Amino acid sequence: MKRGSEEIKEETSPLPAKHFQRREVSIAEDIGIPIDLMVEILKKLPAKSLIKFQCVSKQWSSIIGSSRDFIDSIVTRSLSQPSRDILISFSTTLTNSLKQISSSFPLRTLDILTKNQSYTEAAIYNPTTRQSLSLPETTAGHSHVSTSFLGYDPFKNQYKVICLDNYKRRCCHVFTLGDAIRKWRKIQYNFGLYFPLLPPVCIKGTIYYQAKQYGSTYVLLCFDVISEKFDQVEAPKTMMDHRYTLINYQGKLGFMCCQNRVEIWVMKNDEKKQEWSKIFFYEMAGFEKWHIARATPSGEIVFVNRLLLSCQTLYVYYYGPKRNSMRRVEVEGTKYRRKHLVHICPVPDHVENTMRL
């Protein structure tokens, strides 16, 4: 019996590890897939699969997360698909919960999130890769409250974070994502007396936002992401009497008021003249409790609840101003048994982007 067991043991014993290593190398060499063909195969895969496949090898990780041509192809593919909305809910019972503080640019690939209640610590977040990057402190420090905008330079293909000091320092800093220096740059800012208001909107490389000086009316300011210069935009006086919501309305800057009425103004695409036209006005109460997420390419306005109990059903509403019609879409998988108040944070028109932060 002992002899027989020894014979069986010899027959079932594993092969040496070195033999397996040689075999793996030979299989890879036998396949011999050209790098160009491999890249084309990867481009056909869903973004979720690409994020997982980054751990296959350093080469795959570099292609998926760092190759400019590959990332652009993923963005282009996502843009050709029907637009999608991502809704992120944050519990108000958690003191250290993240909150969205900027969603300015049209290509919804990245967001700025604040890490604390005083909005002094911010991070860039990529919903596709679920990766975040903490922003360094500015030279002014974090002893005061600041406002951050996220913009996109379409010519240099760069993302930039603009940080405005809201109080005494009256300065502005710019952080370029992907810059090897990883430091803030101080630039000239001549509108320090105005308090910037969120959310902004970025259209064709220009960030637009409303601002207010204490005891005065509102103003409309803009920041050119390419030249990194600020300017004031002329707007009708009736629009500056109270706060509006800025939207990208079919490629044009839009002002929308939703209090006891629905009012939409659109700025004409004319660099020499800043002319506005009121495209819709309708008396309707009840819209003040909603959050304006965006405008669809067809001109529909997307609304979501500002606050909601976790046990309640979450709905997204699409309002068509031209037909004065409303449709409702239920969001599944958002209800919880435990009751607590949640803050709804919409990420409109999300575009997949595998860029590594």
From Swiss-Prot:
Superkingdom of source: Eukaryota
InterPro entries: F-box-assoc_dom_typ3, F-box-assoc_interact_dom, F-box-like_dom_sf, F-box_dom
Start and end residues of each F-box domain: 27-73
Pfam families the UniProt entry points to: F-box (PF00646), FBA_3 (PF08268)
Signal peptide region: none
Matches recorded under Gene3D superfamilies: 1.20.1280.50
PANTHER family tied to this protein: BNAA05G37150D PROTEIN-RELATED, F-BOX DOMAIN-CONTAINING PROTEIN
Annotated protein name in UniProt: Putative F-box protein At5g50220
Originating organism: Arabidopsis thaliana
